[in-house]
Design a protein with these regions (language model features):
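Residues lining the SAM
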Residues: 82-85, 109
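Conserved N-terminal segment of class I S-adenosyl-L-methionine
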Residues: 1-73, 78, 82, 95, ...
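Conserved class I S-adenosyl-L-methionine
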Residues: 107-129
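A SAM-dependent methyltransferase catalytic signature shared across enzymes that methylate proteins
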Residues: 143-158
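Short N-terminal helix/helix-N-cap motif within the alpha/beta-hydrolase-1
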Residues: 89-93, 118
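Short acidic/polar active-site loop segments enriched in Thr and Asp
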Residues: 77, 104, 153
Length: 203
């Protein structure tokens, strides 16, 4: 059970900017976004299992499957789904289900598989590839293509959650501290943005 999900400022800003009057958070986990925005939007959440935090507003949550949502066609303005599609057996079918249920748009995120050359050359492995619950691997191009195939019009497909690559390389090389500082002065300042955040309107 994943209980550590907290509000991410990039995702929260996207919700505040793009959500319609109502949203349904699929794979909502502990319900942070549902609870945080409950006074601004009509909110609800679905996850494959129940979480203790749902007790704060039990009528807003229910257990359900992302590929077979217990909602009527066009029943909410916006679908949210953060870090969900990498886990499901058939992400295209899930996006088609999102298309059925939403009236306006979807806002979602997945791990970014566009690993920068400096990190790839180090042979360090992005945790996304070692998590056995992750069965799908997306780039911005592959995600955009799937959105179009499932009837959405991509509005914004960008990268968030920047992480400098140099600390990973320092740890791999196990350099003395003075060499670490020296390398840091001259090394290319690569940044790996770990997450794709996408907004797409219903076609």
């Amino acid at each position: 059970m994943w209980t550590g999900r907290q509000l991410n400022p990039h995702r929260a800003a996207a919700v505040a900017t793009y959500s319609g009057d109502s949203f349904l958070d699929i794979g909502c986990g502990n319900g942070q976004y549902v609870l945080h925005f409950k006074d601004k939007f009509e909110t609800a959440g679905v996850d494959i299992q129940e979480y203790p935090q749902w007790a704060e507003a039990p009528k807003k949550f229910q257990v359900g499957d992302a590929a077979r949502l217990p909602y009527d066609d066009a029943s909410v303005d916006t679908i949210l789904s953060f870090e969900t599609l990498e886990h499901v057996p058939n992400p295209k079918a899930v996006l088609e289900e999102f298309h059925r249920v939403c009236r306006k748009n979807i806002i979602f995120s997945v791990p970014n598989c566009e690993v920068p050359s400096s990190l790839a050359a180090s042979r360090l492995t992005f945790f996304h590839y070692t998590d056995r619950s992750h069965v799908n691997f997306f780039t911005r191009d592959s995600l955009t293509e799937m959105l179009v195939e499932t009837g959405f019009r991509p509005q914004d497909v960008g990268l968030i959650n920047a992480c400098p690559t140099q600390p990973f390389l320092n740890e791999l090389l196990a350099l003395p501290s003075f060499l670490t500082r020296l390398v840091g002065k001259f090394a290319k300042k690569d940044v790996f943005r770990m997450t794709i955040l996408a907004v797409a309107s219903k076609g």
